[in-house]
Design a protein with these regions (language model features):
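Short loop/turn motifs at secondary-structure junctions and domain boundaries
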Residues: 14-16
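Unchanged
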Residues: 50-73, 80-138
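Short beta-strand scaffold segments in enzyme catalytic cores
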Residues: 21-25
Length: 147
């Protein structure tokens, strides 16, 4: 991971710039986090946009794949960008994503993805997969009070 990250938030950008979707999620008032099979850390559901895919569809697909969400309400919050080398960006150039919020009311009984498990937490975790990015996205969502 790089040492320096620059995070910015936007109301909107050109659609073709949006490469990722991240979905801050809650269920029954608890934060929803995923634990990847190959990591000992927790992360917010999210992932890459597929060719020709609407970015909001990316958000819904990633939420379902990574959490097993069956019933949920999801809405876009804002566009974010990260500048700096990360696990998913080796160029260090500014990359853009759609930040969404979801309230999940029902989960599938098992996951069929790279995630080992889904964990519901009262507090935010200490061991983040993306510690310099995802906590700031949640902080921004909390500041906007968009529930």
């Amino acid at each position: 991971l790089g040492d320096v990250y620059k995070r910015q938030f936007y109301d909107t950008v050109n659609d073709e710039l949006l490469k990722f979707a991240v979905i801050i999620s809650q269920s029954n008032g608890k934060w929803v986090f995923c634990k990847h099979k190959e990591r000992d850390t927790y992360e917010v559901p999210g992932g890459h946009r597929e060719d020709g895919e609407d970015i909001f569809e990316t958000a819904k697909r990633e939420l379902q794949e990574e959490t097993g969400a069956i019933k949920f309400e999801i809405k876009p919050i804002c566009v974010y960008s990260v500048t700096g080398k990360t696990r998913v960006n080796d160029t260090g150039k500014e990359t853009f994503g759609l930040l969404c919020f979801a309230e999940i009311t029902e989960f599938a009984t098992e996951l069929h993805s790279e995630m080992e498990k889904v964990v519901l937490m009262n507090e935010l975790p200490e061991n983040w997969t993306y510690p310099l990015i995802q906590p700031k996205l949640i902080e921004n969502k909390e500041n906007l009070k968009l529930y």
